[in-house]
Amino acid sequence: MKSAARILAVGLVLAALAIPQSGMAGGNGTAAFEQLKSLVGHWETDKSNMNKATLDLELTSGGTAVLEKFRMVEDGKPVEMITLYYLDGDQIKLTHYCMAGNQPTMHGTYAPESKTLKFELESITNLKSADTGHMHHATYTFIDNDHFKTTWTFRKEQKDAFTEDVTYVRAK
């Protein structure tokens, strides 16, 4: 009888651990997705920290995804990348289609009190080796309705190589 009670107790503990708890990382994905949806429109860099670039965000796939299109010219050549933001259950995620030729997928944690959305690498496709360069982290800071900042961290040779901080202004 004691072993049956012990098995039942262990089963209840395991079941409790399997149930998502409110307030855990990623449990606020819906709020983060709503914040990203508020960015739909045309944006330009504030030009204080990089070449002029544009960012277009659009709601797609029946409202289930936000598609971001980044465009700029560097050394006379066009630079274009896209990032797709979406929910997986109540977890906000992104997949970034990078000029580096790989596609990192990241999961995010939203902190409404600081207006920040932080993404961490979850998986990546087309990565030739662990030393190959790729985007590894991203942070969005929502300043107001017409301004937001992104910070992307590029990792190469298994260490952070550089960070790009860009502030965007909504084009009117």
What are these regions (language model features)?
Residues 1, 21-23:
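Polar low-complexity intrinsically disordered regions
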Residues 1-9:
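Bacterial N-terminal signal peptides that target proteins for export
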Residues 9-19:
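Bacterial N-terminal signal peptides
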Residues 23-172:
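Hydrophobic small-molecule pocket/channel-lining residues, especially in calycin-type beta-barrels
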